[in-house]
A protein has these predicted regions:
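An amphipathic, aromatic/His-enriched active-site/gating alpha helix that lines ligand/cofactor pockets
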Residues: 30-32, 54-82
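Short S/T/G/P-rich N-terminal loop/turn motif that feeds into the first structured element of a domain
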Residues: 1-31, 36-38, 42-47, 81-83
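Short hydrophobic/aromatic beta-strand micro-patches
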Residues: 9, 52-54
Length: 83
């Protein structure tokens, strides 16, 4: 399954708590879509959020964000995991 890192540039006011809630919404929405959100990272100072997801395509990954909470990614990169 392809692995993607997506980036959200949300700006001021982003909190770890808000992102945790959005991630839980992703997990509740991803079922049956062959999408698996794995981890996320938050930089509160820059308002950036990074999500790691297994999905058949970038669009499939972003569709979960769209349907779960509407916060679609600004950028999505297919990545390979290293040691």
């Amino acid at each position: 399954m392809p692995l993607f890192m997506d980036i959200h540039h949300l700006g001021d006011g982003v909190t770890m708590e808000d992102v945790a809630k959005a991630h839980q919404a992703d997990l509740a929405t991803q079922g049956g879509r062959d999408v698996n959100y794995l981890r996320y990272w938050v930089d509160e100072d820059s308002g950036s959020v990074f999500c790691l997801v297994e999905a058949p395509s970038a669009e499939a990954a972003n569709s979960v964000h769209r349907d779960a909470h509407g916060l679609v990614a600004d950028e999505i990169f297919q990545v390979q995991e290293g040691a």
